[in-house]
């Protein structure tokens, strides 16, 4: 809590550390998802400062999300904008354009085999997780997720399963790590995509498995 309000005091006016579209989207997602914890025991002035900062970040993202680099940074920016638009009073008009932009990014960045241009399995997992959050937030708000988002999740899930070793960790290619423990299982369960085997190569990678031994 102290770190959050220190950041608001130092950088909450839209300048300084953290004011890029991807980081702002990431911050909005975390602040909103952990709002009950962050606001616990705060006084009225602190609570108002928190919501003012959230609103300022939404306005910033509305203008600046197109400047985020294509791929994970842009998905972070748009997912944060959608989450904030759904959660904050008076921000509903921003949801539709953000959802449409997210659908366009899904169609452009996620190929027919469920891969992304960087071919980084851990980055693929991060994008997949953001899309599951966006889909869940829209569904819980009574909105129908765009078909492009749903289809992207359906393409990505088999690819992620194919890129996972028997110990649960992702193959480490193109700068990616094994992924946070339990993140892949949680994201797959949340997406609700029926388990299927990836047809052919998974993002250009082949998988062999026997018992507890895997080769990717």
Listing of model-derived features with the role each one plays in the protein:
Residues 1-153:
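Aromatic-lined, polymer-binding surfaces characteristic
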């Amino acid at each position: 809590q102290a770190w959050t309000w220190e950041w608001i005091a130092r950088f909450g006016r839209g300048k300084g550390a953290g004011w890029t579209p991807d980081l702002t989207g990431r911050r909005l997602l975390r602040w909103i998802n952990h709002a009950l914890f962050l606001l616990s025991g705060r006084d009225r002035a602190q609570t108002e400062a928190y919501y003012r900062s959230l609103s300022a970040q939404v306005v910033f993202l509305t203008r600046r999300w197109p400047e985020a680099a294509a791929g994970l940074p842009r998905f972070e920016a748009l997912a944060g904008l959608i989450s904030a638009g759904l959660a904050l009073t008076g921000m509903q008009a921003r949801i539709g354009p953000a959802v449409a932009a997210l659908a366009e990014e899904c169609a452009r960045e996620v190929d027919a085999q469920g891969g992304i241009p960087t071919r980084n399995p851990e980055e693929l997992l991060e994008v997949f997780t953001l899309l599951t959050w966006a889909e869940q937030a829209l569904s819980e708000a009574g909105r129908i997720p765009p078909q492009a988002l749903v289809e992207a999740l359906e393409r990505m899930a088999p690819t992620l399963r194919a890129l996972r070793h028997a110990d649960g960790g992702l193959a480490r290619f193109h700068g990616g790590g094994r992924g946070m423990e339990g993140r892949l299982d949680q994201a797959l369960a949340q997406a609700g995509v029926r388990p299927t085997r990836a047809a052919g190569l998974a993002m250009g990678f082949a998988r062999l498995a026997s018992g507890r031994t895997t080769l990717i």
